[in-house]
């Protein structure tokens, strides 16, 4: 990554935005509290990665409606935990999906079963997305980095995705913890990125110094709820990010966060 060529424009505004300077790619980190949901728009194509909890279905529905998104090229569930899969039913009830993916095709929970049922209503199946596969979203390229092994601990089965759009890149980590992180780093599978989605809401069980040395992120986003009972984000993770000189954005503090880019310059807009 040619960091010296990357001009960063940070605009934090109180009144939420309707227009950004750059329109080629937008990555929305949606404030779904203690959960994850990310909307990616690129060159007229859309991807939804996770959808928060079941209670967030109406929020996701409204968010897509606000941005007039009626077609999703990809709906991706990083792993079957409810705080990632629950609200995807709202998305599938509003927008037509082309393909639907998860790290599993079956999982015994009501939230995941509802996700499968709503996928089937569109005459689609939940496909297992495996390491090594590459997807395109407009001119952006997305590579599936992991998981490369399946683990008894569901968080370590999170899909890890690396998105590249010209000189800008994002690393999406789901709830990846140290074991999955280590398995990818040992095989040198994690590249540098401009923006890191911090794994597992900033849990103390994720985001090692080794990862940060590999990724060298300029920005990090933590999707986390206010006054959550898990002490997320953990102070140790915030300290590591500070040591890495990474600028941190948090949905509990900043609300919805949108990164917009033309592939060279980056604009960051937040709700608060």
In which residue ranges do the predicted regions lie?
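Non-globular, low-confidence helical/coil segments that flank catalytic cores
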Residues: 2-8, 20-272
């Amino acid at each position: 990554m040619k960091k010296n060529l990357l001009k960063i424009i940070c605009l934090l505004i109180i009144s939420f935005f309707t227009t950004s300077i750059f329109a080629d790619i937008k990555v929305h980190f949606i404030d779904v509290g203690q959960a994850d949901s990310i909307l990616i728009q690129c060159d007229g194509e859309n991807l939804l990665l996770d959808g928060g909890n079941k209670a967030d279905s109406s929020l996701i529905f409204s968010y897509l409606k606000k941005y007039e998104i009626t077609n999703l090229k990809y709906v991706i569930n990083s792993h079957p935990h409810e705080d990632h899969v629950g609200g995807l039913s709202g998305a599938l009830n509003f927008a037509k999906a082309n393909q639907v993916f998860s790290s599993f095709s079956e999982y015994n929970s009501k939230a995941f079963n509802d996700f499968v049922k709503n996928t089937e209503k569109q005459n689609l199946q939940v496909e297992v997305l495996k390491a090594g596969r590459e997807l395109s979203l407009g001119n952006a390229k997305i590579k599936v980095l992991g998981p490369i092994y399946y683990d008894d601990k569901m968080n370590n089965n999170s899909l890890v995705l690396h998105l590249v759009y010209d000189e800008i890149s994002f690393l999406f980590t789901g709830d990846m913890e140290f074991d999955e992180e280590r398995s990818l780093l040992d095989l040198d599978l994690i590249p540098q990125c401009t923006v890191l989605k911090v794994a597992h809401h900033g849990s103390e069980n994720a985001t090692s110094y080794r990862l940060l040395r590999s990724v060298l992120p300029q920005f990090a986003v933590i999707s986390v709820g206010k006054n959550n009972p898990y002490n997320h984000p953990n102070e140790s993770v915030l300290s590591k990010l500070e040591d890495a000189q990474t600028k941190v954005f948090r949905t509990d503090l900043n609300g919805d966060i949108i990164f917009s880019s033309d592939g060279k310059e980056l604009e960051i807009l937040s709700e608060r």
